[in-house]
């Protein structure tokens, strides 16, 4: 089954909003800054999210890692897309 083009566009837009410096990956600082814009988040919560999303353990969330998470959590991504 082909993916919905809107889902792909939403993922790309959301990733770019988190990738503040445009280097193609999301650092824990970028993740924390963007989440704080959405509401209160603790540094522990940011670290927990990084650990969950950074599956290769390099300290960054690549687009591929983000895409894998987004595909597994479509409902959450649709909610986030409404905010962004």
UniProtKB/Swiss-Prot annotation:
<feature type="binding site">
    <location>
        <position position="19"/>
    </location>
    <ligand>
        <name>Ca(2+) 1</name>
    </ligand>
</feature>
<keyword id="KW-0677">Repeat</keyword>
<feature type="domain" description="EF-hand 2">
    <location>
        <begin position="41"/>
        <end position="76"/>
    </location>
</feature>
<dbReference type="GO" id="GO:0005737">
    <property type="term" value="C:cytoplasm"/>
</dbReference>
<dbReference type="GO" id="GO:0005509">
    <property type="term" value="F:calcium ion binding"/>
</dbReference>
<dbReference type="InterPro" id="IPR002048">
    <property type="entry name" value="EF_hand_dom"/>
</dbReference>
<feature type="binding site">
    <location>
        <position position="23"/>
    </location>
    <ligand>
        <name>Ca(2+) 1</name>
    </ligand>
</feature>
<keyword id="KW-0479">Metal-binding</keyword>
<feature type="binding site">
    <location>
        <position position="21"/>
    </location>
    <ligand>
        <name>Ca(2+) 1</name>
    </ligand>
</feature>
<dbReference type="Pfam" id="PF13499">
    <property type="entry name" value="EF-hand_7"/>
</dbReference>
<feature type="binding site">
    <location>
        <position position="54"/>
    </location>
    <ligand>
        <name>Ca(2+) 2</name>
    </ligand>
</feature>
<feature type="domain" description="EF-hand 1">
    <location>
        <begin position="6"/>
        <end position="40"/>
    </location>
</feature>
<dbReference type="GO" id="GO:0030234">
    <property type="term" value="F:enzyme regulator activity"/>
</dbReference>
<feature type="binding site">
    <location>
        <position position="58"/>
    </location>
    <ligand>
        <name>Ca(2+) 2</name>
    </ligand>
</feature>
<feature type="binding site">
    <location>
        <position position="65"/>
    </location>
    <ligand>
        <name>Ca(2+) 2</name>
    </ligand>
</feature>
<protein>
    <recommendedName>
        <fullName>Polcalcin Nic t 1</fullName>
    </recommendedName>
</protein>
<keyword id="KW-0106">Calcium</keyword>
<feature type="binding site">
    <location>
        <position position="25"/>
    </location>
    <ligand>
        <name>Ca(2+) 1</name>
    </ligand>
</feature>
<keyword id="KW-0020">Allergen</keyword>
<dbReference type="InterPro" id="IPR011992">
    <property type="entry name" value="EF-hand-dom_pair"/>
</dbReference>
<feature type="binding site">
    <location>
        <position position="56"/>
    </location>
    <ligand>
        <name>Ca(2+) 2</name>
    </ligand>
</feature>
<dbReference type="InterPro" id="IPR018247">
    <property type="entry name" value="EF_Hand_1_Ca_BS"/>
</dbReference>
<feature type="binding site">
    <location>
        <position position="30"/>
    </location>
    <ligand>
        <name>Ca(2+) 1</name>
    </ligand>
</feature>
<dbReference type="InterPro" id="IPR039647">
    <property type="entry name" value="EF_hand_pair_protein_CML-like"/>
</dbReference>
């Amino acid at each position: 089954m082909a993916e919905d083009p809107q889902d792909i566009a939403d993922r790309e837009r959301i990733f770019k909003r988190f990738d503040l410096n445009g280097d193609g990956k999301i650092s824990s600082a970028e993740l924390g800054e963007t989440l704080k814009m959405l509401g209160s988040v603790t540094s522990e919560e940011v670290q927990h999210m990084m650990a969950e999303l950074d599956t290769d353990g390099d300290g960054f969330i690549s687009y591929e890692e983000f895409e894998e998470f987004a595909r597994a959590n479509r409902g959450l991504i649709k909610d986030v897309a409404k905010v962004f």
